[in-house]
Amino acid sequence: MEAPENTLPAYIKAWEQGVDAVELDVRETKDKRLICIHDDSLARVSESEYTISQETLAALKTVDVGSSRSKKFANTYIPLLKEAFDCKPDKSKIFVEIKPSKISFNELNEMVETGVISKLNTHFLGFYPNAVKSLIKTFDIPATLSIIPAFFDYDYKKISSFLEKSKSFGISQHIDSKKSMNLIKKFKEEGKYCITWTVNNKKYMRDLIELGVDAIITDNPKKLMNVIEEKRNG
């Protein structure tokens, strides 16, 4: 990763490297604003220990989340979800992973009504079946359940049942081993929409491209684009 995660510099850098989509994580502030952040606190990405759900947007926006990565990114702040969409190139997509089990839909509704997000440029992700089901029920936008196969002992039937429970659009699966690769192959062969993460290994990248998965999420977009170019050139 060449820029601090879940920041505008990171998204912009990925777009510049030629990707057609980015994945970001979303949490809700105390005053119900949607911001891009992975963890439930700022401890890992800054010198602050603010808890996201217990602070207002104004308070969280005062925290530098770039300096811990590099002085080059000093004065980089947590973006609103809308700010991430505002820097998105035309005809590109954002995979929006909703981290909590429940959030207010007020801001998402506003973004849909104003045309900021749509089924053409957005795909929701989440780890909670009820949250995914609620997103599907509320919005005309794909929503897919994220799965860590190891939590299911790599059991195809258990995972399939979990996907059905959420009414998931497809499967968003963690790739960590040959077992996980065999699983995603099965899901792809049965016609599921397949998103894979977090793929930083070149061999897995090549194999997933060969398999024809619908999305590969990586911490290293430049490496992935190079692998795609190699495949194109034979």
Predicted regions and their residues:
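Phosphate-group recognition and catalysis centered on beta-loop-alpha active-site segments
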Residues: 1-234
